[in-house]
Amino acid sequence: MKILIITDCHHLLPEEAEKLADLEYDVCFLLGDISGKYIDMLLMYLDKDKVYGILGNHDEFGVLEARNIPNIHCKLIEINGTSFLGFEGSNRYKRGEFPMFTQKEARKLLMKCPKADILLSHDSPYKLYSDGKDLEHCGLKAISKYIKKYKPIFYIHGHQHINSKKTLKNETNVICVYRASIIDTETKDITFIF
């Protein structure tokens, strides 16, 4: 399966969005931190029937629904025999009406969710990329716990503004995407789009 992931497009040029026009993919997930204006630009080049999303820590509630994009936060969906679960937002590091959670809130929500073949989120597992002192980018303990408990085949996220691929001890393939990439779940190849 080819999965198009788009995330953290805080700035997007029309010529970047145009690169999506001829791509072959089975499903597209928006993993947050993409403003409504940029989602509209992306949708000009995407197959709208294949697009799902979750919110990031800078997104306004309702931005996906206003564009008829299914929000899969804490929802399990199945596509071509593969199950996907989404988890939006990040660790709460500031005030405001944005999708952010305390560690306890995230654990309470995510641990009620069912097992999925592929877990998708905006934020990362706790301390995977930092020492935990940077509250904005320290990650969520609930994600680490979910991965340990359910051992998804893939865990894909954004938020860190890096492209990275790691395999954890439990064989979960952890992929951090910055902007746009296609992930082939059979070959485990990653193609960076922009």
Regions found by a protein language model. Give the residues of each.
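Conserved catalytic scaffold of divalent metal-dependent phosphoesterases
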Residues: I5, C9-P14, Y52-C138, A142
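Active-site environment of divalent metal-dependent phosphoester hydrolases
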Residues: H10-E15, I34-D40, H58-L64, R92-R95, ...
